[in-house]
């Protein structure tokens, strides 16, 4: 041991998990192959499931780290961070899509107009259900905002999961019991 090595501060433990980048890459490839309508890539929708599982894992890990550091989950701060992270990108995509449709495809703009608010407010999945629209059976030219269904589901997860996790943490359940409850909720 050199004196410099002994004096160097310990590096904080990284929250970054490189293997998850590999999973993300596989998920992206699966989704892209699915959308290319390749007969041998029918399982590509599994990529969306991978994204959902990764998001659930990472958000749970983030919230449990907060509990370990502070002893609580600050729901308001969590939701504000999600809004600050996602809303600018969502608004940008919707505005740019509207602008491009206005310039290049006015018919598509008319078609997507009812999808704008559900996309901006993260209930596009419920909107599609109410309109009897099947994302998976969409023929012809679906709305360019149709894909927002998956982001809507993720945002709804962000609304529901943190309070449930907070309730479990507040009940001081043992790890085995917590695992059983989480698996039960996941099954639902």
Predicted stretch roles:
Residues 1-188:
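Membrane-interface helix/loop caps of multi-pass membrane proteins
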